[in-house]
Amino acid sequence: MLKTGILFLLLFFGISGFCSGQIADSTYLHELKSELRKKWPENKTINLVFHGHSVPSGYFATPVVRTLEAYPHLTLKRLKEKYPYAVVNVITTSVGGENSLQGVKRFERDVLTHKPDLIFIDYALNDRNMGLDISKEAVEIMINSALDENIPVILLTPSPDMGVDVAAAGNELEQFSEMLKKLAAAYRIGLADSYAQFRNQVTEGRNLLDFMAQVNHPNEKGHELIAEGIMKYF
């Protein structure tokens, strides 16, 4: 009877804990932020890896790549303003045109090999042709691979495609955003809501074109929005 009661409690609290999971808040990276504050000689090199498609790669109007205006570099710039003693590497393992099913195949070889202190995953924009289920499975494999190595993860919801009305309820980008939110909550990891950043601009009356370099790539103003979402964790 006692064993049955203990089993019930373990199941109850285990299931309750999973169901009540929340997306990580600004305290998620407290250990990393502590490292970023350290001065020489106590500090160490921090590796941030950005894994995904053409947007983190820096493609603006294809084939032009504007690395210094893309959100990984803009994030680095903001981090250095906030943490002047930190030695930070921004490493982009992203590939233009790639989806998460392709990205997961090279995750260990191209991402984990850098011994990251933090991994960003940004694939949803290119995953639409695969569907939600396959995308979820691929992203989940990458999350688990990172967490198995005690590496924190921040997922990014999709930046816009001009062919999608971001203000329309239930559009395909919103569906992928909701899927990623659920994953982030289930694993209690971070989520930078790029989709919401752009949608808010539209619902406030701004023209989405002002933030885009081409139909599916943000310009520098658009990348600034994405970097803003990331910096909430720092």
Give the role of each language-model region.
Residues 1-22:
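Bacterial Sec-dependent N-terminal signal peptides
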Residues 21-93, 107-115:
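Serine-esterase "nucleophile elbow" of acetyl-processing enzymes
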Residues 33, 72, 76, 104, ...:
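Extracytoplasmic/secreted envelope proteins and their assembly/folding machinery
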Residues 47-49, 86-114, 126-156:
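Internal alpha/beta domain cores that form substrate/cofactor-binding pockets in large enzymes
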Residues 54-57, 95-101, 125-130, 159-163, ...:
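Solvent-exposed loop/turn segments at secondary-structure junctions
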Residues 60-66, 130-134, 165-171:
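Short, solvent-exposed loop/turn segments at secondary-structure boundaries
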Residues 118:
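Short, Asp-centered acidic motifs that coordinate Mg2+ and/or phosphate
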Residues 159-234:
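Catalytic His-Asp segment of secreted/periplasmic serine-dependent ester chemistry enzymes
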